[in-house]
Curated annotation (Swiss-Prot):
It comes from Veillonella parvula. Its EC number is 7.2.4.3. This is Methylmalonyl-CoA decarboxylase subunit epsilon. GO terms for biological process: sodium ion transport. One of its GO terms (cellular component) is plasma membrane. It comes from the Bacteria. Subunit of the sodium ion pump methylmalonyl-CoA decarboxylase, which converts the chemical energy of a decarboxylation reaction into an electrochemical gradient of Na(+) ions across the cytoplasmic membrane, thereby creating a sodium ion motive force that is used for ATP synthesis. The epsilon subunit seems not important for the catalysis of either decarboxylation or Na(+) transport, but it improves binding of the alpha subunit and plays an important role in stabilizing the methylmalonyl-CoA-decarboxylase enzyme complex. Can also convert malonyl-CoA into acetyl-CoA. The methylmalonyl-CoA decarboxylase is composed of five subunits: the carboxyltransferase alpha subunit (MmdA), the tunnel beta subunit (MmdB), the biotin-containing gamma subunit (MmdC), and the delta (MmdD) and epsilon (MmdE) subunits.
Length: 55
């Protein structure tokens, strides 16, 4: 969790970070493989998801 940084003026909640790391660990990822947890809205990611869903 040392890679957690402030985004949009707010520090990420430790509970939220713990849940995300736990979910990724349950999927087989180690904590060393997690580079960033960024709560940034990216409209490009949304559009890419929509385009992939239409395929």
């Amino acid at each position: 969790m040392s890679n957690a940084t402030t985004t949009n003026g707010k520090a990420p909640s430790q509970d939220v970070v713990a849940v995300i790391v736990g979910a990724l660990a349950a999927m087989g990822y180690s904590a060393d493989q997690i580079a960033h947890i960024r709560p940034i809205v990216s409209y490009n990611w949304k559009m890419e998801g929509r385009l992939r869903g239409n395929r």
